Amino acid sequence: MDAWPRCLERLEAEFPPEDVHTWLKPLQAEDRGDSIVLYAPNAFIVEQVRERYLPRIRELLAYFAGNGEVALAVGSRPRAPEPLPAPQAVASAPAAAPIVPFAGNLDSHYTFANFVEGRSNQLGLAAAIQAAQKPGDRAHNPLLLYGSTGLGKTHLMFAAGNALRQANPAAKVMYLRSEQFFSAMIRALHDKAMDQFKRQFHQIDALLIDDIQFFAGMDRTQEEFFHTFNALFDGRQHIILTCDRYPREVEGLEPRLKSRLAWGLSVAIDPPDFETRAAIVLAKARERGAEIPDDVAFLIAKKMRSNVRDLEGALNTLVARANFTGRSITVEFAQETLRDLLRAQQQAIGIPNIQKTVADYYGLQMKDLLSKRRTRSLARPRQVAMALAKELTEHSLPEIGDAFAGRDHTTVLHACRQIRTLMEADGKLREDWEKLIRKLSE
């Protein structure tokens, strides 16, 4: 196809030559009409492309070919084009082509079995399992998973969809990104086929939509989604959604839609703690058949605090360089390989950023947060900021104390212990902590 060479030419201008040579040039493209399949010689390249380049590839192919629906597969491009497979997620009218294109097939790689559980995602995992086991149950319909990018929301959504299909292979499970819902609706409006559009959605057993925050400000899209939601909910078909924040915090979402989203169960997915991050690194390494010493996993987990995607990116970089150079993966090798990545991560979450974020969150002036005043309205946010600095940076206690108007390191230590103790009993403080972690990890 002509579009792929043009896409590759643009990618060569945007990414380092060694990356293009290693991950992108081995790909072979096949145009299937409603989708484009990129074939890679092995699963490792598929994973690299999915994690690092797929969003940009979709954008470029949408521009050059008018088609941004891309699937990745292991193998070689068939000599003769294969017929487009029937959409697994769409129930179409017998005599009409589906309005919703071949998009959103569930990725079978993502299951509950390979999801790494931790304190930050326990409730989300339990809720997704319940949704898969009891589809349509009003206690968790809709199920809304919210949190920053790269924390595992889509993994849980795919896992629930795959579990639904495993329990009932005939189940019509549709997964779409929010922009795909929008595009399908626009196409239906253009083709004067809104009845068919509605019929397709109303006939499915479960609807999974990613990133509903992008519906904000799209009045007609929200109206159609509102009616689709009502029809599915009334029919006891399950709805699973993700959002990058709690929906009531999304400006531009209609109040009636926010109200509907609150009918079921909303669960926050928070950044993983150190133990979970280390477990994720080790689990992802095993998936790739790579030998990663525990101390290397601990190093990555300690330095990369923001999200799972960054952990995987660091691991992929490490494994790829080890394969290219033939060197063993050691702590020294990891520090050398990830030096720039770790430095950027450290700079992104610095003490000044933490102080400003905490001050803004509690509605304080920076000078008050750093002052010597000990009123409760100032002391508690100040302790939270100190504890976050200890949690999210590599600074020592004395360095943190210096950044807080020259306080003693024992004051910082007391603040850290105090906040940890209070969070066990104070749900509001725990919620504040988790929200601040999410803000600082974005």
Swiss-Prot record:
Main subcellular location: cytoplasm
Region described as Domain III, AAA+ region: 105-322
Protein name (record): Chromosomal replication initiator protein DnaA
SUPFAM superfamilies: P-loop containing nucleoside triphosphate hydrolases, TrpR-like
Subunit structure: Oligomerizes as a right-handed, spiral filament on DNA at oriC.
GO biological process: DNA replication initiation; regulation of DNA replication
GO molecular function: ATP binding; ATP hydrolysis activity; DNA replication origin binding; lipid binding
Annotated segments matching region Domain I, interacts with DnaA modulators: 1-75
Family: Belongs to the DnaA family.
Record remark on domains: Domain I is involved in oligomerization and binding regulators, domain II is flexibile and of varying length in different bacteria, domain III forms the AAA+ region, while domain IV binds dsDNA.
Job description of the protein: Plays an essential role in the initiation and regulation of chromosomal replication. ATP-DnaA binds to the origin of replication (oriC) to initiate formation of the DNA replication initiation complex once per cell cycle. Binds the DnaA box (a 9 base pair repeat at the origin) and separates the double-stranded (ds)DNA. Forms a right-handed helical filament on oriC DNA; dsDNA binds to the exterior of the filament while single-stranded (ss)DNA is stabiized in the filament's interior.
Spans annotated as Domain IV, binds dsDNA: 323-442
Recorded GO CC terms: cytoplasm; plasma membrane
Alphabetized NCBIfam families for the sequence: DnaA
Sequence positions that bind ATP: 150, 152-154
Domain II, as annotated region: 75-104
Keywords, alphabetical: ATP-binding, Cytoplasm, DNA replication, DNA-binding, Lipid-binding, Nucleotide-binding
Localisation per UniProt entry: Cytoplasm
